[in-house]
A protein has these predicted regions:
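Conserved hydrophobic residues forming the short capping helix/wall of the S-adenosyl-L-methionine
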Residues: 104, 395, 533
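Hard-cation-handling environments
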Residues: 197-323, 327-352, 356-374, 379-493, ...
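C-terminal tails and terminal domains of large nucleic-acid-associated
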Residues: 516-522, 526-550
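Solvent-exposed loop and beta-edge segments used for protein-protein assembly and interaction
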Residues: 14, 139, 282, 454-456, ...
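Short Gly/Ser/Thr- and Asp/Glu-enriched loop/turn motifs at secondary-structure junctions
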Residues: 118, 409, 539-543
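His/Asp/Glu-rich metal-coordinating catalytic cores
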Residues: 1-66, 71-279, 299-310, 332-334
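Structured loop/turn residues at beta-strand edges in well-structured enzyme cores
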Residues: 60, 128, 182-183, 283, ...
Length: 550
């Protein structure tokens, strides 16, 4: 018998940033390592991942990180995590690992252990075992995971729909799911993204007919945007390209490499004669395909709309086709993009989130999964809290006792001892790491506050040069301001700023000339000038002090 703890470091009461931890006695299994996008378009945050302090502290217990599929919400943070936990093996299907590796630098590739899994092949860890099962999603080779423990199976669904038309690498193995359910499921962690949607997601996840109508009604160039790694949508577009004998022009080296590799591996099907070059980009017959790597959605399209792309310029008779319905987390970005398209006089077409759905489980899909699994405990994950709650209501309607439906927030622990819920109030500390551009660092709320300060109150930079040996001031202090005051009208204020800065610097040097504490100088200048500026202007600019020795 075992003590099992289940909790999320990310993914609860939010869309994206999925990372779920199952601790079985002294063994830890981590499921997914995702990111989410920031919905605030003004603060320069490209994506967000969860903190992993718990995993770092317990790194020797981790048996592996198990990735369900190759979308950012599930694998987008794996490179950042492995920078801190390079010894932890990562498990995934061939395609999932291939996509994940795109974010690895050469050093990380060398020191990371990636283990390719096959659906329906058990991975043994002694008294525990992992069993992956194929599920249907918008990308090939998506899986759910069954973690076999001495007290029963714990199932994490990942993202899924039930769609009997899907074949090959998109097909759900419903027989294997039913078999697991008959053996007995202790706890089912099931996605909640579309728990509020009635019926099955299929066929509303398939938009080939809509794409066909757009192409049929458009005589001019079409610029189509796709989300990264949405293979199913790309194939729908390719099918219509082939049918209408248009040329597809793929923008950007990363997207070109991804598509070429997918065609080589059989994940996408397209006659290469249909792939155009930059010479075809101005053609009325062209369909230009645009996507983004791991940064804010629509970044490449936005660059084109602003005239910053050297290969393509938006024209009034162009049609911009956003091929994915919007969802919580990117609504602001979508609205901004639609406005920018309208300002340029081009036509904008987007999918309605009411009529068209992503490949996530709706109410009937969830009901089928619950009936197949028949779990003792039901743990809604992956989605806003209201959707988790609705997901729980669906389970209750199907006969799962309300006390066995687990509604949690990130860090809240479900503890099962000998298969029974202890109603633990334990909470694992978790927070967010905000990633800015290509830097893999914790920006934190302080930097966001700085950015707000810059926008509202401007910046003042004080620079000063000291003699390396005597510590005498050789130059400055010089004052540079941006967005704070009108320099020509504020000479007295600037002179007083220089005087105050010089006094603070000299006082610090006199206090300890042998070992000057430059950090203290910067802090003291910021504190004194901050009070002075507020007294004089009622503003609080960002203050930066630069002291150099020569």
């Amino acid at each position: 018998m075992s003590k099992i703890k289940i909790f999320a470091l990310g993914g609860l009461n939010e869309n994206g940033k999925n990372m779920y931890v199952v601790n079985v006695d002294e063994e830890i299994f981590v499921f997914d390592s995702g990111l989410k996008y920031d919905n605030d378009i003004n603060l320069g945050i490209d994506y967000i991942i969860p903190t992993i302090d718990y995993l770092i502290e317990n790194r020797k217990k981790i048996k592996g990180i198990f990735l369900t599929h190759g979308h950012d919400g599930n694998i987008g943070g794996i490179a950042d995590v492995l920078e801190q936990l390079p010894e932890v093996p990562v498990y995934g299907t061939k395609l999932t690992l291939k996509i994940a590796k795109k974010d690895f630098d050469s050093e990380l590739i060398q020191k990371t252990k990636l283990v390719e899994i096959k659906p329906h092949v058990k991975i043994d860890f002694g008294k525990n075992a992992i069993f992956p099962i194929s599920v249907t999603h918008s990308i090939p080779e998506a899986v759910c995971y069954v973690l076999y423990t001495p007290d029963g199976a714990i199932v994490y669904t990942g993202d899924f729909v039930f769609d009997s038309t899907m074949m090959g690498a998109y097909k759900t193995d419903i027989g294997k799911l039913a078999y697991v359910g008959k053996q007995g499921v202790l706890c089912l962690l099931c996605e909640s993204f579309y728990a509020d949607k009635q019926g099955h997601t299929s066929p509303n996840n398939r938009v080939r007919g809509f794409i066909r109508d757009v192409i049929a009604k458009t005589d001019n160039r079409i610029i189509a945007t796709i989300f990264p790694a949405h293979y199913y949508r790309i194939q729908e577009i390719f099918d219509e390209v082939s049918r209408t004998h248009r040329k597809i022009v793929i923008m950007g080296k990363p997207l070109q490499e991804m598509i070429n590799s997918a065609i080589d591996d059989g994940y996408l099907v397209l006659d290469r004669d249909r792939i155009g070059t930059l010479a075809d980009i101005e053609s009325k017959n062209a369909i230009v395909l645009i996507s983004d790597e791991k940064e804010k959605p629509f970044a490449n399209l936005e660059r084109i709309l602003k005239g910053f792309d050297k290969y393509i310029e938006i024209k009034e008779n162009d049609t911009i086709f956003i091929t994915e319905p919007s969802y919580a987390g990117i609504e602001k970005r979508t609205a901004v993009i639609m406005d920018e398209i309208a300002m340029l006089g081009a036509d904008a077409i987007s999918l309605s989130s009411k009529k068209h759905l992503l490949h996530h489980a709706s109410r009937e899909d969830l009901m089928l999964m619950i009936n197949l699994m028949n779990p003792k405990y039901y743990f809604p994950v992956k989605g806003e809290y209201r959707n988790q709650y609705t997901n729980g209501e669906i389970a209750e309607e199907l006969g799962i006792p309300k006390e066995n439906i687990i509604l949690k927030l990130n860090g809240d622990v479900l503890e099962l001892v000998d298969g029974e819920n202890t109603n633990s109030t334990e909470h694992i500390e978790t927070d967010e790491i905000l990633i800015d551009g290509k830097s893999q660092s914790d920006i934190g709320n302080l930097v966001l506050k700085d950015r707000e300060m810059l926008g509202e109150n401007g910046i003042v930079i004080i620079s000063c040069t000291l003699d390396k040996d005597t510590k005498e001031i050789l130059g400055g202090p010089e004052i540079l301001t941006r967005g704070f005051i009108y320099v020509k009208e504020s000479q007295d204020l600037l002179e007083e700023t220089k005087k105050i800065s010089k006094e603070v610097i000299e006082e610090n040097i006199e206090a300890n000339s042998k070992r000057v504490d430059y950090t203290k100088i910067k802090n003291d200048v910021r504190e004194v000038l901050g009070k002075f500026f507020y007294q004089q202007t009622e503003s609080k600019p960002m203050i930066i002090t630069v002291v150099q020795e020569i």
